[in-house]
From Swiss-Prot:
Domain of life: Eukaryota
Composition bias type Basic and acidic residues, residue spans: 659-675, 871-883
Designated gene of the protein: atg13
Protein name: Autophagy-related protein 13
Complex formation: Interacts with atg1 to form the atg1-atg13 kinase complex.
């Protein structure tokens, strides 16, 4: 509680009131509350508007007023003005209303300065002149009242006063609430904001000063209130009044309110600028054209009354609706502009045609076209978008544009814009160039593997650059999996070459269009770069695509479920990327193998012996179409080929170097069993092998061991065995069966019965069971073609050079023990050329009696011909006896020469 002053008991005021009413001490405390209420309110308002001097104590500290729990610096300013309220009381000497006016003092303005106020529209008004005109007096006003505060102690009620001593603490607490409200309100009204703006901007000449004055309600009120006089010429209220509240006391109700001017945006301007602005505003209407004067007379009059004395009257009321960009700029849009920052897709979608198009295409211009066999809705959207778009040759500087890369102020999809004339000659159908240029990150295009093979569309007419019909519009967006190299296409379609797949992030036309759209149906037509026809055609189709009202899945407002679904789909396609790459590479290599092996042929049993026209691919079964999804198909012998049966009972690993003699001689013995049931098997001579089961050397192609049931290829031809399919087999044509039989019959005639080496007549250490089927098939196929000819397999021994089943003897030492070679190399070459055909015939290469057909389609020599020839000679020379070696070599050379001459015939 504040410190109340002591009441003088000798004062004669208290007589009857003391006997029947409140005590003298309670009355004194009530008077102190009313006095400090007025003075404290005045100090708060004055301190917020003007600077007040501070009173210091004897100790040198500031004297602080702590009434109503708000600390304010005590001041001697306005002490005389506030003397009345310092000496007032609640019941006797009642105070008059306290009025505090805050005004703007303009007495320091020079003759060249004017106090102006700026309205919300930016117009300047001369404040002092407006106030003088409204008051009707010519006295030079030098102030503008900003606000007025009023604090009043109203009359006490008519009942007899009661003892209120016990209610004083409650009254004091109510006053605390009021002063908190007053302190806040004093810093929220416009006058305080204007005072703060003056302090920030500064006034070097002190031309504008805010002052306050204190008046009482007893003064004669003015005939015209300066606070309520309008300065701005508008119909809005000039002032506003805010009631802070009323505090009930035993002495009466304390009422407080504030009335303030709504517009306080005052400033000082040069008087000449105000005068010239006033003249310019008046001249603006004097020079209006006469034709427009009649129609706009009423509007001009009202505007003139509003903006007298200032230039920028209606400039802010009009909206700038001119074109955003001028002719000749990139991607021009005309008419009402779309909102700034909107995407180019929204701007294009907002285009609409105007009433008619007066332009016509020139004679030499490129033709435009309409889509063929389109629906009614798509044709309607095509015509509307084609007329609205003014095409240009503007290429985007970047390879892929984003969805918000073009600033524009367009309306949205529901609204439309007028189009510019001259857009008809350039509106055309689809092409692939501009779509690849205009595609965003969502329309980048899939690689050929994900798109699938091109399918011929029913509503597409492939055209060249000079033809009129164009393909139908694209039905959907491409996927965004891009930056991948081109793959060859299958299914009978032409190959689409992606010429710019290697560039950084840019995808070519062929990889960004859809398979069935027919955009690339005429690849290479009008192949000049920068073709105007392709540019204009595809721009029109791009507009059609935007007009199809299809919402991308990424922009569908379907909530969290659609986002998860889209994320799952994108993740699935991203995980399929590597597998599709591998599949495409495999398909590409398979197609190359199909072309390389398509010329390798095989004689069927039903075809005449000398005719080799029927060919069967080595990479697929007979009658099976070549499929792009079966790369590297192994050549499995077909059961249709002469009833051949593959045996897989006892596979063994053999190599080109470890071919044994017994594999060929077993065929001879098995043929004896199949043809002569009563004939016993003869001993097959072979050389002893200390390292009989040789492991196959790793192949240069597969780098792995390959298990074969038997070895029946090509006899002693060391370089014609185990051909890989990937090396190709289309450079040689196999001999016919008749040729092979003639060679075999001639070899029987010239064969010497004593030519066998006795050292070779040793029993074979092992005879494979799988050779039985092979020899039986060989003999049966030979007898079917020529029954008169003796069996090719019935030879006296493998030592003869003429025998097609001549064993490869030297298989003991491997590669490291080959001795030096002797003998005639030319005879070996003749032997090679003459014996190759018969060995193929006897070995069952072309008799369709193979057990395993892993190498049956390869006839061209390997890359290691000469090394294999030398290796075969060295292997034979190891096992042959020293004495009979030269004789047998001579016999071999002679017989080989004779066989070579017979073969040449």
């Amino acid at each position: 509680m504040p410190h109340y002053q002591e009441v003088d008991d000798a004062s004669g005021d208290g007589g009857p009131m003391a006997a029947t009413g409140p005590s003298r001490e309670a009355v004194k405390k009530m008077d102190q509350i009313i006095q400090n209420f007025h003075t404290k309110a005045a100090i708060i308002v004055l301190g917020a508007r003007v600077g007040l001097p501070v009173v210091f104590t004897k100790e040198g500290t500031k004297k602080v007023n702590k009434w109503f729990q708000i600390e304010t610096d005590d001041t001697d300013a306005y002490r005389d003005e506030l003397h009345t309220w310092r000496m007032c009381g609640g019941f006797q000497n009642r105070p008059p209303p306290l009025i505090i006016e805050t005004y703007l003092d303009t007495s320091h303005l020079t003759s060249s300065q004017r106090l102006v106020i700026v309205d919300d529209l930016g117009k300047r008004w001369d404040a002092l002149d407006a106030l003088s005109n409204s008051c009707g007096s010519n006295d030079g006003r030098s102030e503008v009242i900003l606000e007025r505060w009023k604090i009043e102690l109203r009359d006490i009620p008519g009942e007899q006063p009661y003892d209120f001593g016990s209610t004083l603490p409650t009254i004091y607490k109510k006053c605390i609430v009021f002063f908190r409200s007053l302190y806040s309100t004093a810093k929220l009204v416009p006058a305080w904001k204007f005072k703060k703006s003056l302090g920030k901007n500064g006034s070097p000449t002190n031309s504008l000063i805010i002052n306050c004055r204190i008046t009482t309600g007893d003064t004669q009120p003015r005939r015209i209130d300066g606070l309520k006089q309008p300065i701005l010429d508008h119909s809005g209220p000039v002032t506003s009044t805010y009631v802070l509240g009323a505090t009930d006391t035993p002495a009466g109700q304390i009422f407080a309110e504030v009335t303030y001017r709504n517009d306080c945006n005052f400033r000082v301007d040069d008087s000449e600028s105000i005068l010239s602005s006033r003249f310019m505003g008046a001249d603006e209407h004097f020079f209006t054209p006469s034709l427009a004067a009649k129609g706009d007379l009423s509007r001009r009059r009202s505007t003139k009354q509003t903006e007298i004395g200032s230039l920028p009257a209606h400039k802010h009321l009009t909206d700038d609706s001119g074109p955003v960009q001028t002719y000749g700029s990139l991607s021009t849009f005309h008419g009402n502009a779309p909102p700034r920052g909107s995407s180019p897709m929204s701007a294009l979608r907002a285009q609409r045609p105007i009433g008619s198009d007066t332009s016509s295409p020139p004679v030499g211009s490129l033709p435009y076209s309409r889509p063929s066999l389109t629906s009614k809705g798509s044709l309607k959207s095509f015509e509307g978008m084609a007329l609205a778009r003014r095409t240009s040759l503007s290429f985007q500087p970047f390879k892929a544009g984003s969805l918000s890369s073009s600033p524009s102020r367009a309306t949205y999809a529901g609204e439309t814009l007028p189009a510019s004339p001259g857009s008809l000659p350039r509106a055309s159908g689809i092409s692939a160039l501009a779509q690849a240029r205009n595609r965003s990150s969502l329309t980048a295009g899939m690689p050929a593997t994900l798109r699938g093979g091109p399918v011929t569309s029913d509503n597409v007419v492939p055209t060249s650059v000079s033809s009129s019909p164009k393909p139908a519009p694209i039905a959907r967006y491409s996927s965004s999996f891009t930056h991948r190299r081109s793959r060859p296409s299958y299914g009978g379609a032409s190959k689409l070459v992606d010429d710019d797949q290697g560039s950084s992030g840019k995808q070519s036309v062929s990889s960004s269009v859809q398979p069935g759209s027919g955009i690339l149906a005429e690849a290479g037509a009008g192949g000049s770069s920068g073709s105007l026809q392709t540019d204009d055609d595809n721009i029109s189709d791009f507009l059609k695509l935007l007009d199809s009202k299809k919402t991308l899945q990424s922009f569908e407002p379907s909530g969290e479920a659609s986002k998860k679904r889209a994320t799952a789909q994108l993740s699935k396609f991203q995980s399929m990327r590597d597998s599709h790459n591998a599949l495409t590479d495999s398909m590409a290599s398979s197609s190359m193998l199909q072309r390389s092996s398509s010329s390798s042929s095989r004689q069927l049993s039903s075809v005449p012996p000398m005719v080799a026209a029927t060919s069967i691919s080595a990479a697929s079964s007979p009658g099976k179409p070549i499929s792009p999804h079966t790369p590297h198909t192994p050549a499995i012998p077909s059961r249709l080929s002469a009833n051949s049966i593959a045996e897989y009972d006892q596979p063994r690993r053999v190599t080109r170097r470890s071919r044994t003699t017994e594999a060929r001689l077993e065929d001879v013995q098995d043929n004896d069993h199949s043809n002569d049931a009563g004939t016993n098997a003869i001993d097959i001579p072979t050389s002893p092998r200390p390292y009989y089961p040789h492991a196959r050397r790793s192949s240069s192609v597969a780098q792995q061991h390959r298990a074969l049931a038997i070895d029946d290829d090509l006899g002693d031809l060391p370089f014609g065995v185990h051909r890989s399919i990937s090396l190709g087999a289309d450079d040689r044509e196999p001999p016919s069966l008749s040729t092979l039989l003639n060679i075999g019959q001639a070899s029987d005639d010239v064969e010497s019965p004593t030519g066998q080496s006795p050292s070779l007549l040793q029993p074979a250490p092992r005879i494979s069971e799988g050779s039985t089927a092979m020899s039986r098939q060989t003999s049966s196929s030979l007898e079917a073609h020529d029954s008169e000819v003796p069996q090719l397999s019935r030879f006296s021994g493998p030592g003869s050079a003429n025998s097609p089943y001549r064993p490869r003897i030297g298989k003991t030492g491997g590669r490291g023990v080959t001795p030096p070679q002797t003998g005639s190399f030319s005879s070996l070459l003749v032997d090679r050329g003459s014996a190759s055909g018969s060995e193929r015939a006897g070995g069952g290469r072309y008799s369709f009696s193979r057990g395993i057909g892993a190498y049956e389609a390869d006839d061209e020599p390997l890359l290691f011909d000469m090394s294999e020839i030398g290796r075969d000679i060295s292997r034979r020379s190891i096992d042959e006896p020293r004495g009979g070696y030269e004789a047998s070599r001579g016999g071999d050379s002679g017989s080989s020469s004779r066989r070579g001459s017979r073969w040449g015939r």
